[in-house]
Structures are given as C-alpha cells and as structure tokens.
Amino acid sequence: MTSDSTVDKILAGKYPAKQHAENVVERLLHVHPDLTDGVIYLESQRSKLYENSDQEVPFRQRRYFYYLSGCDLADSYLTYSIRDRKLTLFIPPIDPASVLWSGLPLSNSEALEKYDVDEVLPTSATALPTTSYSSLMFVIESQTSRTFHLQNTESLEPAIERARAIKDEYEVALIKKANRISALAHHSCLRAIKSAGNEREIEAVFTKECIANGAPKQAYSGIFGSGRSASTLHYVHNNQPLAGKLNLLLDAGAEYNNYASDITRTFPISGQFTKESREVYDIVLDMQKQCLAASKAGAVWDDIHILAHKVAIQGLLKIGVLRNGSVDEILSNRTSTAFLPHGLGHYLGMDTHDCGGNPNYADPDPMFKYLRKRGPLPAGAVITVEPGIYFCEFIIKPYLEDEKHAKYIDKDVLNRYWDVGGVRIEDNILITEGGYENLTNVAKEVDDMLKFING
C-alpha cells in the first residue's frame, strides 16, 4: 500500500482537470469519430436556500462538473474547446454585499493558481448570445440552464461516466486518503463500543474522528446497526440501545475532497463473539478473502459474485442452516439469495455507488438484479468487495413458505441465528493487471478486532 507521505505528495499537486477533459473527448470520439470541433459546457451546482428560509442548503458539487474542473465553487461554469484544447473556468465575481457576511471569495488569479485550467473568467462573461458559440455544444440537458443554437444533449453524460470508471493516480490518492481517515474512525469505534450505550454514540465517535482528521463530510449516511437491525441493508436510524445485542454492523466512510470511502465491519458489542456469530463471521470473511483473490483485470465480476454465493452456501451447509442439497443445486435454485440478497460490490469514486458499472436492475434473475457492476473488471477501476450473510425475517419468510426453497433450509437451526442479525465485511480495492491493491486498512481478523475492543 502506498505510504501516507506518497499520497500527500500526490495530493499536493493540482487535480488533473485538463487530463480528465481529454479523457472525456476520447470517449466522445468513440461516438463521433469525425469530431474536430465543439465545446463541452458544464455548470456547477447552484447555491440554494431552504424553503421559506435564508439558511443555505449544504452544498454538494455536481460530480460531472468537478471531474472536469476540480472546482468546488457554487454558481460556476466551464467550457472546454475541443479544437483548441482550452479549459476555461467561470467563477462568480465579488459581491460586496456578501463579503460582509462571508469574506472575500476566490479571485480569478487565485483560482488560476489553484485549479488545472487555462483561463479563469467571471461568470458574467458567459452572459453572451448563444449564437456566439458557432461550434456544437456538448451539454447535460438536466444540468444546463441555457440553450445553444447547436447542441448535443445525448453524448456528454455517458462519455464522462465511462471516463470516471477508470481512476488516475490522483483520484486513487484521494480515495486512499478517505480510507485512511475512515480507518482511524473505525478503530476509534472499536475502542468505544464496550462503553457505549446507544448506536448514536458510536456514530458520534465516527463522525468526530473524521472531522478531526480533515474530512468534515460523510460519503453517505452511515449504518450503525446493532442486533437484528444489522439485517436491514441500509439501516440508518442509528438510535437504538446496545444492551442485550450481540453485534454491531458499522458501515461508514469519510468523503475527502469529493471522493468516497465505503467500509463495513461487524464486531461483538461485548468484546467476544457468540458461537453462532463467530460461525457466520468466519463464513463471510472466507467469502471476502476468496473474492479478493479472484479480483484482477479481466475477471468477470458476475463470476466473482457467484463465487461469493458458493462460499456462502458451503458455509451455511456446514453449520446446518442449509441442508438437503449440493452447492450447485442450491445455487441454481437461488435459495442463497435469502441470505445474500445484494450484489457483491460497486464502483467507488466521487459517488459511493459510482457510475460506469453497467448494472441491470431489470434482470429477472434475483442473484444479479442488484449487482451494480456487470462484466469484466478493467485495470484502474476502484470497487468495493462486500459479501454478507443476513438473517432478516421479512426477507427469509417467503423462502420458508416456498417449497422450492424451504426444503433446503433447516428452520430449527435457523432459529438459533436470528439474533446474529447480519454480518458484512467491506473493503475498497484498486483493480490492477495482476490482481488488486487493497486501499482499506481496517482490522477484520477476529483477534485484531478484539484487541481494539478489549484494549
């Protein structure tokens, strides 16, 4: 894994906006091979107020705009001339009234020094007749406030999404930084669990550690699910007492400069796993290790997802939750989706569920319906590997009532596992030609976790 000093050295440079613009043009050329002229036009997120209030809504930059600018300012624009290879950023001019409350904004010269662009102009410079652009304008229709005489609204968004699927060195460094901050927060939560009385206390520990280490934003709403709440995949109430619960499933990650981390660990609240919890944990850890070992450029993600199910079935047969069938038979009947209903992982980048994965949510096969990445893995992709086993009564009950599945499930044995709730283990990896680099350094071996918990 790259050292902290190397990551910081990379991030001391500029976000590579011009290279990203070239990446997008390269994808546009796949669709428009004769393209020699044209302008990419993107708008940043607008500043907004809450309804009937003068309080600003928390700002989140548009990811398409950020990818081509590295600029986190509201009410801005950019153009990229394909013919001239010129990237121009337009930022709001100084508003004397707002300086009173918010201080001086970034000047044009400061922005030119900060961002990887060729020119910085005030946004008033874009208040031009649309006929001033004689070239074809590539825009994202839903994120554009103006109409141009010649415009293409179909090609830009998919071109950016395809480009974003492959991360460069700078983007990987941002994700590594987010992971390292999240690792500090996860380990602080392990240390705090035995003295905590409520899920929200652990969420507070996690958030505090992220903010203290330079990541004030979370990549997504964290999951701090104790006991049976861990069987709800996106449980976000985070307000239940911990007393009497076996385990805590902690799925949370910091965002660093608009890039996400996404890490899950499951651990015993008391400092010791029960027999049933340890059995399930060991199965899930084996699932993850085997899936990690299979991950490399060219490997088909669908096949690795099937591998996760096969290992899960083997483990559940061993502990007796599943019975009366071979691994292949139970797999072909899709009974394992009762215990692993989600996909193995998803692309990670500026969005937690990042673009470019080519999912098919209309797939009639329940094993693949929620798989957010389909097809072969390319080198340079960052993806999560997050197998899990869950004991959710609402999900499993229909399987128990369907003879197709019920014959494979031992209800008496299953009853011993409801309180385990759910176990998920999730790391973020960079796909390489020969395998992968794990960007996540959070304890997951049982002995390592227990050292943090028990001091």
UniProtKB/Swiss-Prot annotation:
Mn(2+) 1 binds at residues 262, 386, 426. Keywords: Aminopeptidase, Hydrolase, Manganese, Metal-binding, Metalloprotease, Protease. One of its GO terms (molecular function) is manganese ion binding. Binds 2 manganese ions per subunit. Its cofactor is Mn(2+). The keyword Ion transport does not apply. It catalyses: Release of any N-terminal amino acid, including proline, that is linked to proline, even from a dipeptide or tripeptide. InterPro entries: Aminopep_P_N, Creatin/AminoP/Spt16_N, Creatinase/aminopeptidase-like, Pept_M24, X-Pro_dipept-like. SMART domains: AMP_N (SM01011). Its EC number is 3.4.11.9. GO terms for biological process: proteolysis. It comes from the Eukaryota. Mn(2+) 2 binds at residues 251, 262, 426. Belongs to the peptidase M24B family. Catalyzes the removal of a penultimate prolyl residue from the N-termini of peptides. This is Probable Xaa-Pro aminopeptidase GSTUM_00008071001.
